[in-house]
Amino acid sequence: MAAEEGGLNLTVSETLQSLLESYRRMQMPIQQYLSFILIPSGAFFVVTIVAAILIDLPMSIRAPIPLLGLLAFGAALFYPKILISQRKRQLNNRFHLLVTHMTVLATTNIDRMEVFRKLAREEEYGELANEMHRVVQLVDTWNQSLDDALRRRAKEVPSDAVSDFFDRLAYTLGAGQSLKDYLITEQEQIIQEYSTVYESSLDSLEVMKDLYLSMVLSMTFALVFAVVLPILTGTNPTMTVSAVIVMYIFVQSGFFLAIRSMAPYDPLWYHPPEKSSPTDERATKSFAAGVGLSLVLLFVSFGGMFGFSPVALGDIIPLVSEPLPLPMYAAIPITPLLIPGLVMRQEEEKVKARDGEFPSFIRALGATEGVKQSTTSMVLRTLRKKDFGTLTENINSLYKRLNMRIETSEAWRYFTAECRSYLIQMFSEMYLVGREMGGSPKVLGELIAENMNEVLQLRQQRKQATTTLVGLLYGITAASTFAFFIGLEVVNILASMSLDLETSSNFDVGTLINTGVYDIPLIEFLLIIIIMFGAMLSALMIRTIDGGHNMNTYLHFVTLTWIGSLTALATKWLVNVFLSI
């Protein structure tokens, strides 16, 4: 017992210490935060408590008032902690790319401070670029040495990986070792740290999947009870079902936000706003076609249902007769969204294939340039004849632009824009900058290829996690829909049986079961809503973990909705068949 109390005290102490540390690391002074945010929110909490005591209203209205004040005070109290956690995540997300970029710059003929200045101007690195800028400010403005500036920032950054890197770099530079030698020897350790963080994120997602499964099963049972129990208690089933659905939506949304915060940052796509590609054109056309057809089907289906459309679904879709089962009115109108989903799925596979070929290409390019001591266009003249899969066409386009004397940097930017790959864009930019500043092409090619291969191996693990999640969500959708409609159909059959009993005898069935409180079509409509909401959130979860294009969401959304709709129809048919025997 004493050990448990000691462990609890230690946990509370660690939490308080972590919270105080987050206050210390805020950009805003602590006194200013206390005066303008924390103390006013605490006063607001006290006011809500007093108001709940003094106001002459029913308890059901007064009770939530202090909860509003508690929410405001809790948000103000823990906001610095949340802010520091976000900064830590931003620092860790691109850390391996920044170190690789730093190594590329260090292999060139520029001063080590110029390396930090260039990285500070790279907006792509976000919070890491800000840290580089702070280091540069300490050196340029406050006349500190680079190693002293790094030690000072190591104490302030919330990321352990970045802090440790700054500490070791400061010690190495202070000892007289060159930045280039240190970074080349550190590459393997940095990638290993990134792999550890990446894999731990995937492990956390595995735990979240188990928790999500337990939550959905619990909420499914709650919803089934909300459908069935009113037949015995006589309460309004529409209210109980609506209450459970609202809770279901909040809990599912919370899990989605948690999964989004845990997923490793590893975007697949690169979207340059100033340069379009054939991929953009196909995406735009497929999106317009899918959304346009969905709107037409939506108008026809509901217009035919309510009588304000001259045609119905049965008139334009073969083998469909009116009236349709209610689940079909949810599934059929959104089916055309498969068009953009499938198109972007194909384009995404091409991007992944280009990513797989790029390490071989950049290694061959660097090695050949190093041996021949010639320009990139001269090397590409022979290199483009090799088979690099889907990347070959982009390499040919790069060669043609360089051969037309288009500026080298602009030709490479067109190359990355056509590839549409985030990694290819980042590493191509590093190679280009390294070559322009006199770096060894062979060293650059080997360095970039090795780092990209490590990231691609981690992506394979991410793909396996996504595949497992897809199977889990598809199975959960079918199982929960089956449970929903079993309860609804049992109630529907009991209601029809009670009517038969009342007409065939003088027995008052209402003393045993309360079927008159049910509005079956309305409850079925509510169940269809929760199926579609679950399909939407499940599709978003898959896209978040997969890291792919936003339009991939449509593919899983439509598929999950059809699974739910067909399961609902099959369940209703099976229950009627078995109970009629």
Regions found by a protein language model. Give the residues of each.
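Selective transmembrane-helix segments that form parts of the transport pathway or gating/packing helices
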Residues: 37-41, 127, 131, 287, ...
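Hydrophobic alpha-helical segments characteristic of transmembrane helices
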Residues: 1-23, 97-119, 149-153, 160-203, ...
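Juxtamembrane boundary at the C-terminal end of a transmembrane helix
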Residues: 570-581
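Hydrophobic alpha-helical transmembrane segments in multi-pass membrane proteins
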Residues: 130, 160, 164, 215-223, ...
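Bilayer-spanning, highly hydrophobic alpha-helical transmembrane segments
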Residues: 34-56, 65-74, 196-258, 297-299, ...
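Cytoplasmic juxtamembrane regions at transmembrane-helix boundaries
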Residues: 278-287, 355-367, 543-561
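Membrane-interfacial amphipathic helices
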Residues: 1-55, 79, 83, 257-326, ...
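Juxtamembrane/interface alpha-helical elements of multi-pass membrane proteins
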Residues: 62-154, 164, 311-417, 425-462, ...
